[in-house]
Amino acid sequence: MPFDRQKIVKAVKEAKARAKPRNFTQSVEVAVNLKDIDLKRPENRFKLEVVLPHGRGKDVKIAVIADGAVAEAARKLGLDVISSAELEEIASSPRQARKLAKKYDFFIAEAPLMPKIGRYLGRYLGPRNKMPVVVPPTLTDLTPIVEKLKKTVRIQLKNNPVVHAPVGTEKMSDEEIAENIEAVLNAIIGKLERGESQVKSVYVKTTMGPAVKIEG
């Protein structure tokens, strides 16, 4: 099911036009419905990180779980830091752990802390597809990683044959959002055994607006 750029732009334009004005900037999301895929077979499920060419159009919340050099590098960039001691405190409260997992879009963690993170937070971060980006404890500059994460979306195909992904905000141009959608589609199609022939339909919508089909 090949998609023409102009048809994507047209659907984005319509989705934005049909969205009622809200007192906040709405996100734009894409839903990719798949067919002829057996999700009982683990090899057909996947997790992906897609770098959007035009970014997400809004701030991304990043927390760094670290001590020492990595924590210092994070503070220089104004990022929230969770120390190993704080990690153990959070682990003692499931409510706090869930709140933490919900609050941030991405986590960065120094490698030596990963066993603790897996033990204490894995059950909260794993299902949300938010396990940390792992860095060496000697890293002194997080800028390249942070800049990449600001443009990254994590998507996964798990139990249902549909993949959802944020692709921008209503304030972005139709063309920018369309290019972001193309990046997501190409990444998903690249993971499918029979490529685009397994794409059943694609819809785009704003947070509160109706879904608009992208005609193939």
Swiss-Prot record:
InterPro entries: Ribosomal_uL1, Ribosomal_uL1-like, Ribosomal_uL1/biogenesis, Ribosomal_uL1_3-a/b-sand, Ribosomal_uL1_arc, Ribosomal_uL1_CS. It comes from the Archaea. GO terms for biological process: regulation of translation; translation. GO terms for cellular component: large ribosomal subunit. Keywords: Repressor, Ribonucleoprotein, Ribosomal protein, RNA-binding, rRNA-binding, Translation regulation, tRNA-binding. Transmembrane segments: none annotated. One of its GO terms (molecular function) is structural constituent of ribosome. Pfam families: Ribosomal_L1. NCBIfam families: PRK04203.1. Binds directly to 23S rRNA. Probably involved in E site tRNA release. Protein L1 is also a translational repressor protein, it controls the translation of its operon by binding to its mRNA. Part of the 50S ribosomal subunit. Belongs to the universal ribosomal protein uL1 family. This is Large ribosomal subunit protein uL1. The gene is rpl1.
